[in-house]
Amino acid sequence: MDKNNQKKFVLVHGICHGAWCWYKVKAQLEAAGHSVTAVDLAASGVNMTSLDEIQTLKDYCKPLLEFLSSLGSDDDKVILVAHSMGGISASLAADIFPSKVAAIVFVAAFMPDISNPPAYVFQKLVKDVTQEVWMDTVFGKPDRPLEFALFGPEFMAKYLYNLSPLQDFELAKMSVRVSPFMTNNLAGTISFSEDRYGSVTRIYIVCGEDVAVPVDYQRGMINDFPVKEVLEIKDADHMPMFSKPQELCALLLEIADKYA
């Protein structure tokens, strides 16, 4: 592919997951000739940061922020592709480095607005969720107020991987790690800014069979903070990179052609 047509994708995972969850998407985008970086956030995937070192959202997102910081002024802008809780991480990155981001693509992701604290969109969904719904998910409360979570296999099977291949679910069971839970204690209470994060092009990909972040909730976030374009993968569960990787890649390539 001509260098002028090559796009730069940066893939941002959600909690308990890591760069590993993007293996199908990364391979397909690279096969199409594009540059793809899948980041392990702190204490995720193979990143060896200890949970004790994560006190803030910036701490958790440090690998992503360091990658964007390393890009020179001559580098092309990146397309941030954010899944699930990765939407909050990508939004922080865009708030800090708006000039380096061509667009954020929210894939069944929590999308902060510019009037509420960053964690609000997640806390609003889970505030009434009972322990029965979380099933075998394990929560830890250390001495400090930051909370941690580890998705259990029963929860993942029912809510995250319900339409995904069994092999990918097995990969997830072996690979998930304890992650910081998105609270105001972690993310702070200051909203992202209108002139930085708010100025970056945002696209939302709705996953039509998502039972973790239901379609009505996905569309509610879009209504509350409208985006440039809304696309949908009708038969995707919460993990479209596993359940509908080809459809997801096709949309990402379409987005890259339009916005990067």
Curated annotation (Swiss-Prot):
The active site is at 84 (acyl-ester intermediate), 210 (charge relay system), 238 (charge relay system). Keywords: Hydrolase, Immunity, Innate immunity, Plant defense. This is Methylesterase 7. It comes from Arabidopsis thaliana. InterPro entries: AB_hydrolase_1, AB_hydrolase_fold, MES/HNL. Its EC number is 3.1.1.-. GO terms for biological process: defense response to fungus; innate immune response; salicylic acid metabolic process; systemic acquired resistance. Pathway: Plant hormone biosynthesis. Pfam families: Abhydrolase_6. Disulfide bonds: none annotated. Esterase activity is down-regulated by salicylic acid (SA). Belongs to the AB hydrolase superfamily. Methylesterase family. Coiled coil: none annotated. It comes from the Eukaryota. PANTHER family: METHYLESTERASE 3-RELATED, METHYLESTERASE FAMILY MEMBER. Methylesterase shown to have carboxylesterase activity, methyl indole-3-acetic acid (MeIAA) esterase activity and methyl salicylate (MeSA) esterase activity in vitro. Required to convert methyl salicylate (MeSA) to salicylic acid (SA) as part of the signal transduction pathways that activate systemic acquired resistance in systemic tissue. MeSA is believed to be an inactive form that needs to be demethylated to exert a biological effect. One of its GO terms (molecular function) is methyl indole-3-acetate esterase activity. Induction: By pathogen infection. Expression of MES7 can restore systemic acquired resistance in SAR-deficient tobacco plants. It catalyses: methyl (indol-3-yl)acetate + H2O = (indol-3-yl)acetate + methanol + H(+); methyl salicylate + H2O = salicylate + methanol + H(+).
